[in-house]
Swiss-Prot record:
Organism: Salmonella heidelberg (strain SL476)
Record-listed NAD(+) binding positions: 3-14
Key words of the record: NAD, Oxidoreductase
EC number: 1.1.1.17
The family this protein is said to belong to: Belongs to the mannitol dehydrogenase family.
One annotated GO molecular function: mannitol-1-phosphate 5-dehydrogenase activity
Entry-linked HAMAP family: Mannitol_dehydrog
Residues that span the membrane, as ranges: none
Protein's recorded name: Mannitol-1-phosphate 5-dehydrogenase
């Protein structure tokens, strides 16, 4: 089996790329970072530090790399069996034209073997969104062939991979936590279902997408935003602050009540899942910066993302949301010189005030009770 993975960054190398290579799949990375490409093609291997209670160093070998903006990547798409991505939500649209060109070449060369594409991004139904971008880049005459031969498979991914702080300055070295979860929608594949250790197949993906979004992502973001306000540098420092931990745990319990109501998750098992995530945030081997986790607050405050979507669920079912509201208020306070979205958020609040700004960003009714609650919490934490 041959696979092409877009995104040779830390998540690409430390998570999805590692799983594919470990499964014996012939793997090629595609990226724009020439330093990383050159290193991969010189060595064809790299080291992954898996940290937790039992620390280990794994070597991933037998890998190659191509530029994601050259002709080589188009040629590869014509012949591989699987394409995966870990490029970040905003970059999916940028890689779509190359994928479209590769699919056209695949069709022209008469390669009718099924191809499956899986976007492994921190977003809901990311592959479906990628499919939309790819279809927009195709001529009408090619779309039916793509629909017939190419599976666009949505997935939920979960592994904390902080930026590398390698003392060796090795551009390929990466550190990851022990925990990982890659759940894919088996109803969307073309051809036979793949057997890849570490890939879990389900016919109820949205339950797992929302479980991860409402728990890991919600908790991670609120920990970062409250931690930044309190002057903590890392997620571990923040979650060990009892006042922050109480709000984060409370928010995950509030979002969890939505999941239990919506999907029938077992309450005791979900409580254990929350505890596991709190333990992951405490991992002393992961130096995860609150500023990194908090970046892009406009996206994280949008209607379909980790703060507002669970809040909407509590409104739908008439459930408590006091801690989620505290997290939203903390997100509105997020400031970072390194993050354009943080600067845009600050400008919007200055221009329109917190009530109108939150309504514009989140899609919530400016005159609703819940926006008033969030504004009160925002003003109380100035």
């Amino acid at each position: 089996m041959k696979a092409l993975h877009f995104g040779a960054g830390n998540i690409g190398r430390g998570f999805i790329g590692k799983l594919l290579a470990d499964a014996g799949i012939q793997l090629t990375f595609a990226d724009v970072n020439q330093v990383v490409l050159d290193a991969l093609n010189a060595r064809h291997s790299y080291q992954v530090h898996v940290v937790g209670e039992n620390e280990q160093v794994d070597t991933v070998s037998g890998v190659n790399a191509v530029s994601s903006i050259g002709d080589d990547v188009v040629d590869l798409i014509a012949h591989v069996d699987l394409i995966t991505t870990a490029v970040g939500p905003v970059v999916l649209e940028r890689i779509a034209p190359a994928i479209a060109k590769g699919l056209v070449k695949r069709k022209a060369q008469g390669v009718d073997a099924p191809l499956n594409i899986i976007a492994c991004e921190n977003m809901v139904r990311g592959t479906t969104q990628l499919k939309g971008h790819v279809m927009n880049a195709l001529a009408d005459g090619d779309k039916a062939w793509v629909e017939q031969h190419v599976g666009f498979v949505d997935s939920a991914v979960d592994r904390i991979v902080p930026p590398s702080a390698s003392a060796t300055h090795d551009p390929l070295e990466v550190t990851v936590e022990t925990f990982s979860e890659w759940i894919v929608d088996k109803t969307q594949f073309k051809g036979a279902l793949p057997t890849i250790p570490g890939m879990e197949l389900t016919d109820n993906l949205m339950a797992f997408v929302e479980r991860k979004l409402f728990t890991l992502n919600t908790g991670h973001a609120i920990t970062a935003y409250l931690g930044k306000l309190a002057g903590h540098q890392t997620i571990r420092d923040a979650i060990l602050d009892e006042s922050i931990r109480a709000v984060v745990k409370g928010a995950m319990e509030e979002s969890g009540a939505v999941l239990i109501k919506r999907y029938g998750f077992d309450a005791d098992k979900h409580a254990a899942y929350i505890q596991k995530i709190l333990g992951r945030f405490e991992n002393p081997y992961l130096k995860d910066d609150v500023e990194r986790v908090g970046r892009q607050p406009l996206r994280k405050l949008s209607a379909g993302d980790r703060l507002i979507k669970p809040l909407l669920g509590t409104l739908e079912y008439g459930l408590p949301h006091v801690n989620l509201v505290k997290g939203i208020a903390a997100a509105m306070h997020f400031r970072s010189d390194e993050d354009p979205q943080a600067q845009e958020l600050a400008a919007l609040i200055t221009e329109k005030g917190p009530q109108a700004a939150l309504a514009q960003i989140s899609g919530l009714d400016a005159n609703s009770d819940v926006v008033a609650e969030a504004v009160n919490a925002y003003n109380a934490t100035k």
